[in-house]
């Protein structure tokens, strides 16, 4: 049996190619159908995000060794990957990474722990892996084709490893994105965010990320001010927290400042939007209560003179970048600890899989022998019931039982003799307990 990963990501492929190999739900279902029909694998999980597309396959019938059968199967998988997206196979191959067995297990765990992400240690990827696995599980159940126990165990093990890495290392403790750093800064300055008034200026991607972080931390009073009201309203719809969010025009920006404990601004404006005079007026109405202003726009949205006002804490994007750089260094240290955990866990899983593979073989062998015994015993009981001589029946039973049990091993030894496989014969003979007498009883 073998586990295979075929993938491209932000390190190996352009955005244009990543877009071409993305899997919509419809294309994912088509892929599952094609994989089953062509017998490329018995179980599969497809992970498709903006930064990566990875196909995890489990084939019980392909040897993990690098033999010709394995190579042919690998080429079939690559060709299918290209065909399903109508791509030239060479174009895909140039950007493709291929990992098998323990390397594949290790890769899945690294991906799920955020060690292979664009932002080191980011937690979102684990949720995306879980969704990909659940999608595959649901599809298998709908088709009455259960996912293989080995593959299911691999993903469950991966999820527990990711949890362990989060618990035992500091991989996710430090902010490494501008949006997250802004929110972390707010949580450091104010004990809690839930009862604060927060004003966001802008409605782009960064402000969306900031809003999501804030809402996740229980913020109940959020204002969004933007030059285009329609875009701000669209953002509110995407956030799905309408009752907590108020939309303001830029003409109402002063009203928002008058209420705000925290201001985070990120627009594309070529001019300053929040002047020192506007903040001074707001502070007079707020009686100089602490106000945090985080300007993450380039060019700047906020007049830098606001930092001289009483009660105002002013940070720019450069301040955040220095925080992020320090935090990245911390994550780099934590990632080394995470790698040690992953290497050990991946090795443990692969050892289990190898033993599990052969335990199935042993169980099948025992079941086969038991079936032979039951069949012959049933015939012997019937013969004795028909008044045949018990001694003759038992003699025949023992003779037939011996012949049936040694039939397959005898054929295997004959095949090895024809091939001249001396080492194979020695190993097989030793396993059967019939090593050459001279070897067992050497002359003194």
From Swiss-Prot:
It is an enzyme of class 1 (oxidoreductase). CDD domains: NAD_bind_Glutamyl_tRNA_reduct (cd05213). NADP(+) binds at residues 202-207. Its EC number is 1.2.1.70. GO terms for molecular function: glutamyl-tRNA reductase activity; NADP binding. It comes from the Bacteria. Keywords: NADP, Oxidoreductase, Porphyrin biosynthesis. Signal peptide: none annotated. Pathway: Porphyrin-containing compound metabolism; protoporphyrin-IX biosynthesis; 5-aminolevulinate from L-glutamyl-tRNA(Glu): step 1/2. The record marks 107 as: Important for activity. Substrate binds at residues 49-52, 117, 122-124, 128. Pfam families: GlutR_dimer, GlutR_N, Shikimate_DH. GO terms for biological process: protoporphyrinogen IX biosynthetic process from glutamate. Possesses an unusual extended V-shaped dimeric structure with each monomer consisting of three distinct domains arranged along a curved 'spinal' alpha-helix. The N-terminal catalytic domain specifically recognizes the glutamate moiety of the substrate. The second domain is the NADPH-binding domain, and the third C-terminal domain is responsible for dimerization. Belongs to the glutamyl-tRNA reductase family. PANTHER family: GLUTAMYL-TRNA REDUCTASE. During catalysis, the active site Cys acts as a nucleophile attacking the alpha-carbonyl group of tRNA-bound glutamate with the formation of a thioester intermediate between enzyme and glutamate, and the concomitant release of tRNA(Glu). The thioester intermediate is finally reduced by direct hydride transfer from NADPH, to form the product GSA. Homodimer. Catalyzes the NADPH-dependent reduction of glutamyl-tRNA(Glu) to glutamate 1-semialdehyde (GSA). This is Glutamyl-tRNA reductase. The gene is hemA.
């Amino acid at each position: 049996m073998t586990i295979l990963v075929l993938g491209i990501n932000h390190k190996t492929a352009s955005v244009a190619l990543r877009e071409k190999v993305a899997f919509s739900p419809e294309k994912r279902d088509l892929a599952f159908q094609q994989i089953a029909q062509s017998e490329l694998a018995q179980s599969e999980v497809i992970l498709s995000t903006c930064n990566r597309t990875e196909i995890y396959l489990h084939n019980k019938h392909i040897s993990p060794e690098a033999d010709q059968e394995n190579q042919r199967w690998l080429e079939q998988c690559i060709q299918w990957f290209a065909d399903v997206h109508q791509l030239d196979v060479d174009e895909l191959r140039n950007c493709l990474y291929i990992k098998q067995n323990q390397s594949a297990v290790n890769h899945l765990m690294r991906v799920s722990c955020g060690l292979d992400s664009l932002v080191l240690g980011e937690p979102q990827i684990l949720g995306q892996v879980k969704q990909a696995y659940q999608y595959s599980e649901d599809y298998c159940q709908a088709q009455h084709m259960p996912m293989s126990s080995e593959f299911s165990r691999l993903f469950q093990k991966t999820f527990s490893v990711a949890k362990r890495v989060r618990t035992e290392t500091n991989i996710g403790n430090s902010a490494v994105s501008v949006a997250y750093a802004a929110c972390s800064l707010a949580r450091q300055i104010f004990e809690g965010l839930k009862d604060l008034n927060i004003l966001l200026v802008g409605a782009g991607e960064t402000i969306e990320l900031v809003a999501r972080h804030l809402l996740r931390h229980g913020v109940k009073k959020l204002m969004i001010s933007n030059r285009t009201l329609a875009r701000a309203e669209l953002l509110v719809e995407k956030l799905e927290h309408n009752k907590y969010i108020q939309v303001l025009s830029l003409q109402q920006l002063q009203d928002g400042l008058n209420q705000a404990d925290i201001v985070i601004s990120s627009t594309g404006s070529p001019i300053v939007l929040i002047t020192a005079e506007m903040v001074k007026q707001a502070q007079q109405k707020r009686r100089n209560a602490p106000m945090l202003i985080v300007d993450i726009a380039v060019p700047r949205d906020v007049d830098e003179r606001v930092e001289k006002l009483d009660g105002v804490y002013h940070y720019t994007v450069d301040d955040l970048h220095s925080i992020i750089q320090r935090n990245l260094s911390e994550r780099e240290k934590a990632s080394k600890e995470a790698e040690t955990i992953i290497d050990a866990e991946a090795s443990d899983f692969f050892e289990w899989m190898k033993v599990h593979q052969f335990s199935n073989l042993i169980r099948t062998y025992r079941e086969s022998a038991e079936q032979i015994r039951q069949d012959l015993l049933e015939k012997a009981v019937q013969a004795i019931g028909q008044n045949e001589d018990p001694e003759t029946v038992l003699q025949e039973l023992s003779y037939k039982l011996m012949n049936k049990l040694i039939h397959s091993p005898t054929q295997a030894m004959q095949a090895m003799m024809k091939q001249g496989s001396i080492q194979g014969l020695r190993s097989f003979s030793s396993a059967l307990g019939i090593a050459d007498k001279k070897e067992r009883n050497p002359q003194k």
